[in-house]
Each structure stands twice: as C-alpha cells, then as structure tokens.
C-alpha cells in the first residue's frame, strides 16, 4: 500500500462539540467525518481499523461454534408487537412507514427477527442448540448523540443469539460466550474487565458486561484486590458488616442553623462523615419510607427498586415530606416520637451506634442516636448503597473503583422472547417445548473509540498492534531526489509484505516533520525512515510508537525487531 494512492486527510482543526479524546483524534486523523447528528462516514483509514476489529470478532465467534447470518435492519411493527416492545422500547426506536403505510422500525437489536427465523426453521430438539450471529449496522434514535462513534445513533454491532432446549444447556453456552469474549478482547490488545451487571431493558436472568478501562468511561466499576471479582457499580456488593457497635452516648439535640449537607454538619460537629446517617424520603406503591444511608455513601437506585414493593419508588417531594415529617430536606431524620415512619436501613447503618441524624426540625440535628432506644429497629435491613473505594470485598480483598466503557454484554434471556413469540420445538416425546435463549452483543464501532480512549498521547493515537491500520509505516525522505532511495524503500516494503507484515509506504514527498506527525497521529506502531544518509551508513531509522524509542538499525536487525 502506498499513501500516494490512498486517501489520507489529517487535520488540526477540532469541532467545538468534540468532547472525548477519541472523537477529537478520529476527526483529526481523518478516520470519520460527520454526516448529520450521530451519523458518521467511515473513511478508508477508519474502515481499515473497523474491519480489523470485525475480523477478530468473527474469527473467535466461528471458533466458538457460532454460525454467521444476516437479518434485515428494517423490521415490521407486527414482529415487535409480539414481544410487546413496539411501545416499551421508547423513543430510541426509529419508526417508519412505507408507501403502503405499513409500519416498520430500524432495528436497534434483533431478538424479534432472529426468534421469528428460528421458530420457522427449527422444529425438533435434535436441531438444538444453535448460536447465530451477525455483524451489522444498527440504529438507536438517541435524544442527544455525543462523543462521536462512542454514542452515535448509527453503529456497527455484533449480536449473537443462542437457542436451547434446557436451562442447563443455556448456561453452558453462556459460559462459552464469556470465555469467547475474554479471548476477543485479549486479542484486541485492550485492558478490560468482565463485570457482573444488571440486565436492563433487554431483560433476562443473568448478565455480564465487558468494559475497556478508561478514565473517560461513563460506567463505574468495582473490583477486588483479592480475586477476579468485578461488578458494575449498580450490582457491586461489599462484605457484610460486623456486629452492631456498642452505644456509649446519650441523645442530644444540637443547633445546625445553616448546615443541611452531611459534610457541613459533620464539619460543624467535628466528627467523621462516617458517623452521619442521611435520610432519603421515598414514595412507593405502599406509601412513605425513609431510606437510611451512612453519610459517605450514596443510594443505589437499582438495589432499592428490587426490594419488595419498591419497584416503582420515587423520591418524595417537599409537600409529601412536610405532610409526613413536618420538616424539610436537609433536616430529615428517623427519630419520630409519636409517629409511625417506615424505615429501610442500609446494612451499614443497621450496625451503627451513636450516630447523627436530622431532628425533623429546621436548624437542628440529633447526636448520640441509637437503635432500640431512640428509634425502633428498622422495618427492612438491606444493601441499598453503592460500594466505595476501600470497602472490604466479599472475598476478603479491598474494593477498587475504576471507570470503564462498556463494549460487550452477554445475557441469559431465558424464555422471555420465545414465550411471547411462541418459539417451540418438539422434544424427544413429541411434546412442544418453549426454547430458552441467550443474547451476546459486542459494540464493534464503539471498540474503535474505546481503544483510542485507552491508548493515546499528546501526539495522537497509539493503536494496539492487532487493530492498527498498518503495523509498519516506511517513510521516504525526498523520494524524488534519488531513485535509489525510493527503490530501497520499495524493496523493504516488499520484504515486509512477504513476511505478512501489514505495511504502508509513505511516498507522498511531504516534509519529514509533517510526515512523522501524521504517522504519530494515526498511530502506526512501527515507523521506519529511509533516507540518503541512512542508506549511506547501511541503516534505517526505527521508531516504536508506544515507547518513542529511536534506533538506527541494519536491515537484518530491523526485520527481526518488526517480526518479534
């Protein structure tokens, strides 16, 4: 490949709305160009990277026994009504009509289409299990597309769906896919974590997310120093706290005239934030509750919503708070003599003693509060908080917190879609049995951006070698000055290509500084300079992109270094 024959257009200009490093660098490197909000054209350079990601994903899926197929991106309303997702999916589902006014959607996911295919094609248990996958463009009508291809409306995804006769067989394939995803992200050269996760809108019985570790990640991850335990912050748990502490203080009411925030109250009282208990007023289908958390902890909405009767909880408003407690936010507390207030205490709060709470009186808090003496034992004790850095993990290690970009997700869907769409096969006794399903997705185009978020410096992208557009760039200084120079470069190019090293020849005749800056920006792992001075000395200048190490090497040593 010669750059003089390749469309490469880099730029120094960055749009004001390009917030993430990956968005800025993909634009500067000429990998993508914006067509409309959330819609991007992939240039020849960007497509080379995208195709390399696809190739690794496809290779490992095939190795795992999955079979590739291709489903329509435009799908009929009737199919989505069978699964009851035509309305439930919400405004992200792009709906369209054809000339006959028949309604369709642009597929954001393909559970319905693949289930329809399978229920027509599979009739016997002897045809199971099967795992079908595709690599296809999807569309979600994001209300505010941002971050370039990280959260675009149109994106490339690998989605796979497995069908089974039994739950045990589904679990086996689920574990097969988890192992496959680990191989995929390892081959991509990325630092990643596999974490326990909530199944979200797709639903299902068990799920695991795969995250690329990056400071810019939107997801918060918790993992242990003691084992491979890792979870999304929504699902992460800490070790069960020890026994309740012994009460030593008496109850007192103290003035906190302007202090509403936990941090301000504890600063005024000169006590640790961990001694504060904050009260969060919530409304549920069964009435008013106070959810109690330690002062340095935050509420985990998902954990709270999973408690009996709290699936539809919401935060109480000021009118509701005044009606139930006669107070206002900032001074709420669970000590309510003469009133029957229902309390949900986080596990950590349930073992506290001598803690501080709001007095349900503006300008006052209570100190030295203890269970059983100053307020009744909580109606519910449960884990309703987010874990924090330094928590004791369930395996005895310490919890560490990092940010991640979700690039893969595996689900055990169960029979949710198969039951809704009547997808059955005959078992060995001739009885119709509903199939059980697994779902396995990878954000192919998102991986490209995530890789950049994890691998870059001030000069540009530093691609992991497996997905770089080229492994080696041979840069020619003054190619038109002396035919010997270009001949030597072409010979080196041929030798590298014959050794299956993906190589590009930069024969554009640009100034060295401009040429080198381009190669650093687009992230080529190895740069070789062919120059008149180097040839006279029998050497080539070699530079490793990741380490910035520069050496003058003879050809034999150079080729050995590149192939290593």
UniProtKB/Swiss-Prot annotation:
Q: What is its EC number?
A: 6.1.1.15
Gene Ontology terms for molecular function: aminoacyl-tRNA deacylase activity; ATP binding; proline-tRNA ligase activity
Q: Which UniProt keywords apply?
A: Aminoacyl-tRNA synthetase, ATP-binding, Cytoplasm, Ligase, Nucleotide-binding, Protein biosynthesis
Q: Which domain of life is it from?
A: Bacteria
- Which BP terms does GO give this entry? prolyl-tRNA aminoacylation
Q: Which InterPro entries match?
A: aa-tRNA-synt_IIb (IPR002314), aa-tRNA-synth_II (IPR006195), aa-tRNA-synth_II/BPL/LPL (IPR045864), Anticodon-bd (IPR004154), Anticodon-bd_dom_sf (IPR036621), Pro-tRNA-ligase_IIa (IPR002316), Pro-tRNA-synth_IIa_bac-type (IPR004500), Pro-tRNA-Synthase_IIa_type1 (IPR023717)
What Gene3D superfamilies does UniProt report for this protein, alphabetically?
Anticodon-binding domain (3.40.50.800), Bira Bifunctional Protein, Domain 2 (3.30.930.10), YbaK/aminoacyl-tRNA synthetase-associated domain (3.90.960.10)
Q: What does this protein do?
A: Catalyzes the attachment of proline to tRNA(Pro) in a two-step reaction: proline is first activated by ATP to form Pro-AMP and then transferred to the acceptor end of tRNA(Pro). As ProRS can inadvertently accommodate and process non-cognate amino acids such as alanine and cysteine, to avoid such errors it has two additional distinct editing activities against alanine. One activity is designated as 'pretransfer' editing and involves the tRNA(Pro)-independent hydrolysis of activated Ala-AMP.
Assembly, in brief, is: Homodimer.
Let me see what the UniProt entry remarks about domains.
Consists of three domains: the N-terminal catalytic domain, the editing domain and the C-terminal anticodon-binding domain.
Annotated family = Belongs to the class-II aminoacyl-tRNA synthetase family. ProS type 1 subfamily.
Q: What's the name of the protein?
A: Proline--tRNA ligase
Q: Which organism is it from?
A: Xylella fastidiosa (strain M12)
């Amino acid at each position: 490949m010669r750059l003089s024959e390749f469309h490469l257009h880099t730029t120094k200009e960055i749009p004001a709305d390009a917030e993430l490093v990956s968005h800025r660098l993909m634009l500067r490197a000429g990998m993508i160009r914006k067509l409309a909000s959330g819609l991007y054209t992939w240039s020849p350079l960007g497509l080379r990277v995208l195709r390399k990601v696809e190739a690794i994903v496809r290779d490992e899926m095939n190795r795992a026994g999955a079979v590739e197929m291709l489903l329509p991106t435009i799908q009929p309303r009737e199919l989505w009504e069978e699964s009851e997702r035509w309305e439930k999916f919400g405004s992200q589902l792009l709906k369209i009509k054809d000339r006959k006014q028949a309604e369709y959607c642009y597929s954001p996911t393909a559970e319905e289409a693949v289930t329809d295919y399978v229920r027509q094609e599979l009739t016997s248990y002897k045809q199971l299990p099967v795992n079908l996958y595709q690599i296809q463009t999807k569309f979600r009508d994001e209300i505010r597309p941002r971050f370039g291809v990280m959260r675009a409306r149109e994106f490339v995804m690998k989605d796979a769906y497995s069908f089974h006769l039994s739950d045990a067989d589904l679990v086996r394939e689920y574990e097969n896919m988890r192992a496959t995803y680990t191989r995929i992200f390892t081959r991509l050269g990325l630092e990643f974590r596999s974490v326990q996760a909530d199944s979200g809108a797709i639903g299902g019985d068990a799920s695991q997310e795969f995250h690329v570790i990056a400071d810019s990640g939107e997801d918060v991850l918790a993992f242990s120093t003691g084992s491979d335990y890792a979870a999304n912050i929504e699902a992460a748990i800490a070790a069960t706290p020890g026994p309740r502490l012994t009460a030593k203080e008496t109850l007192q009411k103290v003035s906190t005239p302007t202090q509403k925030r936990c941090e301000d109250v504890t600063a005024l009282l000169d006590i640790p934030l961990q001694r504060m208990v904050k009260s969060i007023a919530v409304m549920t289908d069964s009435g008013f509750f106070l959810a109690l958390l330690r002062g340095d902890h935050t509420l985990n909405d998902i954990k709270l919503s999973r408690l009996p009767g709290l699936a539809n909880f919401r935060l109480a408003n000021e009118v509701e708070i005044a009606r139930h407690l006669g107070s206002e936010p900032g001074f709420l507390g669970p000590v309510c003599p003469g009133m029957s207030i229902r309390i949900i205490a986080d596990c950590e709060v349930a073992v506290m003693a001598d803690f501080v709470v709001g007095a349900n009186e503006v300008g006052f808090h209570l100190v030295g509060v203890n269970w059983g003496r100053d307020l009744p034992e909580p109606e519910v004790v449960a884990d309703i908080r987010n874990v924090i850095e330094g928590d004791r993990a369930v395996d005895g290690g310490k919890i560490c917190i990092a940010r991640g970009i979700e690039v893969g997700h595996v689900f055990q869907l169960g029979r949710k879609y198969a039951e809704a769409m009547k997808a059955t096969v005959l078992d060995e006794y001739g009885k119709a049995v509903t199939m059980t399903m697994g779902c396995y997705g990878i954000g192919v185009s998102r991986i490209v951006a995530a890789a950049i978020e994890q691998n870059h410096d001030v000069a540009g992208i530093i691609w992991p070698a497996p997905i770089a557009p080229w492994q080696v760039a041979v840069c020619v200084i003054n190619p038109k000055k002396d035919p010997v120079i270009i001949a030597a470069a072409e010979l080196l190019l041929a030798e590298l290509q014959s050794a299956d090293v993906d190589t590009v020849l930069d024969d554009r005749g640009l100034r060295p500084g401009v040429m080198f800056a381009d190669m650093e920006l687009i992230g080529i792992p190895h740069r070789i300079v062919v120059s008149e001075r180097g040839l006279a000395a029998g050497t080539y200048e070699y530079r490793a992109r990741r380490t910035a190490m520069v050496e003058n090497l003879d050809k034999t040593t150079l080729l050995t270094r590149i192939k290593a």
